[in-house]
Amino acid sequence: MATVIARASESQHWYTQEGKPQYTVTAKNGVQRNTTLRDARTMNLVPSVTTILNAAAKPGLEAWKLNQMMLACMTLPRAPEESEESYIERVKHDSKEHARQAAERGTTIHGALESFYEGIMLAEFLDYQMGVSKAVDAHFGAKNWLTERSFAKDGFGGKCDLYTQDGEGVVIDFKTKEFRQEDKVEGYDEHLMQLSAYRVGLDVPKARCANVFVSVTDPGLVKIVEWTQEDLERGWQMFDALKTYWQVKNNHKVI
């Protein structure tokens, strides 16, 4: 297994066998473009954990998307003489815009949290940074935390938000979410599979794993969902089965 420091987003989904992100390649015209499955086959790249997880249904995400679509319908009146097709496309665009804004907000907060653990405090995001720091320290104690490390192992790759090798290790993934103190926050199987794969990929197979939920409704509010070792064993079995499905479906297996 190879592990390297990586600060870019994991959105392009591909890694070299040395653990380096390969999010783009140089096109024939000299311009950088997104890496494709065809490129991955040629370059022997491995898919990211999230790419593999995308092969499974995500009921929670689909329910959220449906809610966004319904909200768009409620707030966008149909114009006089507007065709049904045009109205539907406008509603789709509006609902996707909300999703895009939420994704951008999440990426920005992730970046601020990464900066904090690299020793950089940002006034604009101080509530988020201090909220996470206090919650993580209270839950896990003082650790030698490492940020945004990428890896490749056994046919998959990824990039972890925060982890430590202290003891048997701790692996953390940040999730931004709209919630308040009175709201119940819980993890889903996709979160469990992601963390179980990360701890295997990072060579800390017995690590404690947790999702750290960061409220975008109440900056500074943080809730931690730690998974049991029994859960994580089940998560790894699910991920490993899904990885095999992905490899067969896409006819791409790196040995």
Report each predicted region and the residues it spans:
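Metal-dependent nuclease catalytic cores that hydrolyze phosphodiester bonds in DNA/RNA
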Residues: 1-157
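Mg2+/Mn2+-dependent nuclease catalytic core
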Residues: 145-251
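Acidic, carboxylate-rich catalytic segments that either coordinate divalent cations
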Residues: 255
